Amino acid sequence: MKIVSQENREVLDSIRDFCAVRNHGTALENTEEPSPRAQFIIDLCNKIGLECEVDYFRSGIYHYHNLILRGSSTRMVIAHHDIVNPNSDNANDNSASVINAILLKKIVPEINVIITDGEEVGFAGSNRLSQQIKNGLFGPIEWVLNLELTGKGGKNFMIGGYTGVLTDRIKDLFNPPIKNTPASDCFPLSANGIDTNVINPLPLLTEGQSDMLNENGYLDNSSWYICHTEMDTFDKISIEDMEEFVTEVLVPIVK
């Protein structure tokens, strides 16, 4: 599969350099200045012509930076930029999701995209975002789709076990497998009454079975077990799959 457009390639190719950026540690090591990964995102958005607002805030003694790519839609997509292991590429968790969210914003400019901070250390960014949504900072928001581990799998994906308008929409469009997932940025959103779900593409198993089955076969979730390790490397994701996921799954959901 070839990348459809040169414009898409410019965004997708940035994943290699993004994976090479090293933070000092988790978001608890942040300072008042954006982390190296956050600064990379800001610079990338400037380079490709997307306006990126830095929402700096503190929670206790800790510093966080949510990155806001504002749109006119009532729909929102989020992905977290913080990490656990500073020695890892953090390719699938969650560098690919950040790049996919930016590509989606480029293709569908009206969508609201928020790149959150602090997911790995207690969901500080999404907790702040949930309060901002409730306070009307973005106008009425119908639902929030959370991108997690979106580096490989393309149009084969699963969603979390949340209920609501967003979940019904995804089921009507694709009827994917549904699985209860560990806590993510969806947790504070759902706790604050905001319609949300998490989406995670996964490649197909080449042999054997799993507990996630779609029309194409059984999904392979082995990538879940290398999150936060130095095995979560750039070579284990696919920019072709990333583009397929954005153009054939995310675009229909958000439009």
Q: What is the predicted function of each stretch?
A:
Residues S5, T196-L219:
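Short, solvent-exposed beta-strand-terminating loops
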Residues E10-S14, E33-P36, F40, R128, ...:
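Extracytoplasmic/secreted proteins, especially bacterial periplasmic and envelope-associated proteins
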Residues K106, G208-K255:
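His/Asp/Glu-rich mid-to-C-terminal helical/loop segments that flank catalytic regions of hydrolases
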Residues R16-S72:
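A non-catalytic alpha/beta surface segment that caps or lines the substrate-entry region
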Residues N85-P188:
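Acidic/histidine-rich catalytic neighborhood of metal-dependent amide-processing enzymes
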Residues S73-S88:
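Glycine/charged-rich beta-loop-alpha catalytic/anionic-binding loops adjacent to active sites
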Residues M1-S35, D82, S222-D232:
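N-terminal capping segment at the start of a domain
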Residues M1, F40, L50-L67, R75, ...:
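Catalytic phosphate/metal-binding cores of nucleic-acid and nucleotide-processing enzymes, i.e., regions
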